[in-house]
Amino acid sequence: MYGQPQKKIEGKEKKNFFTNCSISSISTEGRLMAINDKYLVIPWQKPGYINIVDSNNPTNLLQNNNIFKTENSNILDMEFSPFNSNILALCSENNSVILSYISEEITNFNQSNCYKSHKNKVSFVNFNPIVSNLMCSSTSYGEIHIWDSSKMKPIIEFRLSSPNSIFWNPNGSMIGISTKNKFFYIFDPRQEKYIFNQQISHTMSTSKFAWLDNGSIATIGWNSNGNKYLYLYDIKRNEKPYSSILIDKYTSPTVPFVDQEMKLIYSVGKEESYINVYDYSLEGLKKCSNFICTETNHFSLLLDRKYLDKNSQEVDRLVRFTKTKNIYLFVFAIKIKTLNLNKWLIQMKT
């Protein structure tokens, strides 16, 4: 990245975003909340219940009355549709995926359809980012389905031992899967086979991943000495990572979040208070900034860029569920620190 502007990321924590988050006591690798430009949804107190609030109106969640029962079992993962902000997918220990519609004023929560083809509790669910009726879901036992939400029928079924995260790539043509045995796989539905697999960690700690683009991924793993690294892989070359950078020596699970437009990676550790920010390119990784939060992180989500405040200089928003049962917002802004400015301007002109 010689001669190019060096990114300087600034961050500010907004406390009391949502308070008294009495989340249900479940053990899951899935997402403990879902948020978009309209709503925040969390599994609430009892198995099968959810709390829905206006995501633009911070409040004490114990004072909210929009609590709905979805079913009788624990909710293990949830995601909003990228095509309709009112549609929410929930998966549960009841071996099913529920598609629901939230009314504009949160007066109704209608369960429109239910996918019931899994034989075990469903741990993960994801909307395809391009095809509105295409979805994937997985059980913790490795039963993975690609299915049509308009017909509620499976299209492709395959198995993989102990998934702990599963996501479509940005153009919706492949599925990435990380597993509890520290491997990462990419499945191509068109060929109905795995086209990539690598061991990404050498310790007992499990790893998760994020897509950088359609041909590369970021993942966090531990080397044989127990050091935690951020790795970048090119899936066209089924070999060692093309770039890596040391994060720390802690053993806590850490999740990478990627902003593909700004070429930034955020690493956020569970039960830690640190946020590290990295700039990435084809030439490799470079650390931009690091932040210490006031409260320990339990779970986080990176808000989609289309939901950012267009009138501000913010580039990303990280939504954090803390150990004290509060939901805080961490807002990032960018400053460009230019090295060799004249040389860089000449390069841009040519």
What are these regions (language model features)?
Residues 40, 87-88, 134-135, 175, ...:
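Acidic/hydrophobic-patterned starts of short beta strands in beta-sheet-rich repeat architectures
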Residues 1-61, 288, 307-350:
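Acidic and/or Ser/Thr-rich intrinsically disordered tails and linkers
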Residues 30, 37-39, 47-50, 65, ...:
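A common structural microfeature
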Residues 47-52, 96-100, 183-185, 226-231, ...:
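Structural motif
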Residues 91-93, 97-114:
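Right-handed parallel beta-helix
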Residues 59-88, 120:
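Blade-loop segments of beta-propeller domains
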Residues 117-121, 125-285, 291-295:
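WD40 beta-propeller repeat blades
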Residues 23-36, 78-83, 125-130, 168-169, ...:
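Structural signature of eukaryotic scaffold interfaces centered on beta-propeller domains
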